[in-house]
Amino acid sequence: MNLKPLADRVIVKPAPAEEKTKGGLYIPDTGKEKPMYGEVVAVGAGKMSDSGQLLEMPVKAGDKVLYGKYSGTEVSVEGEDYLIMRESDIFAILG
């Protein structure tokens, strides 16, 4: 992938949607919930504070993160689906 996010934006590879329920029933594509977690693949340089200082990003490539259901913009690059979102759309880093 040759994408580099700008400023405080983050590129996330969403986790795949569940294919079947815990009981073993297969879920059709129309019934699948969008996952609200994924892996960070790239981060921007950060954002500028009011004083003009560059604030470092709290996430880094490889982090597993939780984000809002409607966060980010969906993009497809080289057949792969990604989300581009602001750092503030990320709720937590999974440890």
Swiss-Prot record:
One of its GO terms (biological process) is chaperone cofactor-dependent protein refolding. GO terms for molecular function: ATP binding; metal ion binding; protein folding chaperone; protein-folding chaperone binding; unfolded protein binding. PROSITE patterns: CHAPERONINS_CPN10. InterPro entries: Chaperonin_GroES, Chaperonin_GroES_sf, Chaprnonin_Cpn10_CS, GroES-like_sf. CDD domains: cpn10 (cd00320). One of its GO terms (cellular component) is cytoplasm. Transmembrane segments: none annotated. Heptamer of 7 subunits arranged in a ring. Interacts with the chaperonin GroEL. PANTHER family: 10 KDA HEAT SHOCK PROTEIN, CO-CHAPERONIN GROES. Belongs to the GroES chaperonin family. Together with the chaperonin GroEL, plays an essential role in assisting protein folding. The GroEL-GroES system forms a nano-cage that allows encapsulation of the non-native substrate proteins and provides a physical environment optimized to promote and accelerate protein folding. GroES binds to the apical surface of the GroEL ring, thereby capping the opening of the GroEL channel. This is Co-chaperonin GroES. It comes from Chlorobium phaeovibrioides (strain DSM 265 / 1930) (Prosthecochloris vibrioformis (strain DSM 265)). The gene is groES.
